[in-house]
Amino acid sequence: MKKRDYKEYEKMLKKEQLKKIISIGAISIAAGLTANYIYKKNKEDDYTTYKRVFNSDTDSNVYFIGGGLASLAGAAYLIRDCNFKGENIHIIEGLKILGGSNDGAGSPETGFICRGGRMLNEETYENFWELFSTIPSLEYPNKSVTEEILNFDHHHPTHAKARLVDKYGDIVDVSTMGFNNIDRLELFKLMMTNEENLDEMTIEEWFNDHFFTTNFWYMWQTTFAFQKWSSLFEFKRYMNRMIFEFSRIETLEGVTRTPYNQYDSVILPLKKYLEGFGVDFMVNTKVTDLDFKAGRGITVSAIHLEEGSPINYDSKTDTTDGVISDIDNLENQSHLDDSDEEDSKSNNVEKDPNDNDEKHDSAIVSEVMKSLHITDGEEKSSTNNEKTNSKEKIIYLNDNDKCIMINGCMTDNATLGDYYTAPKFDDSKPMGSELWEKISLKKPGLGCPKPFFDYPKMTNWESFTVTCKGNTLLKYIEQFSMNIPGSGALMTFKDSSWLMSIVVAAQPHFKNQPMDTTIFWGYGLYTDKNGDYINKPMMECTGEEILIELLYHLHLIDKKEEILKDIINVIPCMMPYIDSQFQPRKMSDRPDVVPKGSTNFAMISQFVEISDDMVFTEEYSVRAARIAIYTLFNVTNKEICPVTSYNKDAKVLLKALKKSFK
């Protein structure tokens, strides 16, 4: 064979071999796809059959008491994982709006308000991310809420450059934790101590005085809102659960932020999802008592309701901007008239207290408070069994019905002030704990609300939301902190007598926030102490006084006139029970999600016991809801995402150990 012919033959042979390889590959891929399709089809058929058998009784109903995240998540699990009919799911809420502590409301004219802000975490919110990966985004077609949040967060990474600021206005070097060997030893000893040995102990009972002067304590305390007298038990849980964040606590890189406030970004899409399936929302309806069947078990037989004035609560009254219609109606009421934009608010500060404009401002905030169903501390509380414009009703449960209750809410009894008015301190018995206390006396194993809700002077702190026309103040804060809005997370003034911190979120933070309006949020932990510059306790301060105290700590008081003229409103919010879930307690004070002996009853909140997990998080609410649904309905074809054991990860622990010696 000639050399040329051989080469041609070789080429032909290679082509034939290539054809065979491609054919074999194609056959393999087709076979694989077919097998995968058959596997998935069989799996879907099995799941569908399971669901049909599971929900053979279409008359069963589920009643959620409380309209917070836990109940909304529970309803979603019923629909998604139990094939439950939406019309058989009933969410009963005592307030006029759903969402619980996940709030966000206001307008450019009256000012915006968030009682609090939630810092999510990509590494530890296992069930939260899983659930919201199946909830459609309202902003992006074919995207989930999880994708929307994580995409936003990855494009707006957090890296605080001014985590702590001292009284001289200097940014503190927080590259070191500030521990001495005694601090390290006490911390290590705590990590090794069984939870059962920490009943009713406080943080300050465990650690020496030096520990509370360390950079670590200031950062850890203000990131999670601990007090020295908070539960040592919960502090240990946080150390175990958030050990992954220990080594980067000074930059807060682990903070995951939502595109908007959590009502707009979390509650609203979840609510819209549930509405699409016909879930029944009963707002402005207070549950006053539960009846149980006689005997040793725990079986709810009846739910006692007190309905308030009728509210037309449907998709039309809850706009896509996350503000209910009561506030929408306020949007034409400006805090400052357009004709007065040239006048500085600082020139109006010394007005007579009886000035009509001031009354107008207070009236606006009063309407905002009503829309959020927040009292001013003088109105008759909903916990006083007021019968005006209300009617009593009893729902009798059938044998297959279930009752799932949110036992306690940290934002109960919250009150608002405004630029000229301090919020009142409402230490009356909160609505959620009142019901919990009633039922805890009827059956064993339902926990005890007293350790959490009997000490409002210890469990309170105060937040404030500042709304500005333009970005003058935000630009000064940006120059001071070296962080653009949305990149710095928390900035704490460590020497502040109120222990004040602020957060400047990416703008806009509300869906109905115009581009020429900016907002930021802050809070103080020690509300009973006089300010460093304003000689009165934070809880007695107006929004203006809180802002001026802040300007002193920012060393911007010389820019006061320039800044104040652009302020639309500063709305302080006093929350008497906001730290109640951190109170020292016994192991038995928090009930199990599904108490022992329960046949149709579960409790879901920040006040139930979930081993290894930490309270004061969105994850805790979602995990509690999933446990309740999967247990009561015997869901076996899906698993609850376990708590990720970073405290047992050698690499994470080594990193944390190294950090503790810096």
Where are these regions (language model features)?
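Glycine-rich Rossmann-fold phosphate-binding loop(s) that bind the pyrophosphate
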Residues: 66-68
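Active-site-proximal substrate-binding core of FAD-dependent oxidoreductases
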Residues: 633-662
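Extreme N-terminal leader/targeting segments of oxidoreductases
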Residues: 2-62, 80-86, 321, 655-661
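Conserved FAD-binding subdomain of flavin-dependent enzymes
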Residues: 110-149
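Helical element adjacent to the flavin cofactor pocket in flavoenzyme catalytic cores
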Residues: 242-326, 372-373, 378, 384-401
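Rossmann-like flavin
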Residues: 138-241
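Glycine-rich FAD pyrophosphate-binding loop
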Residues: 79-105
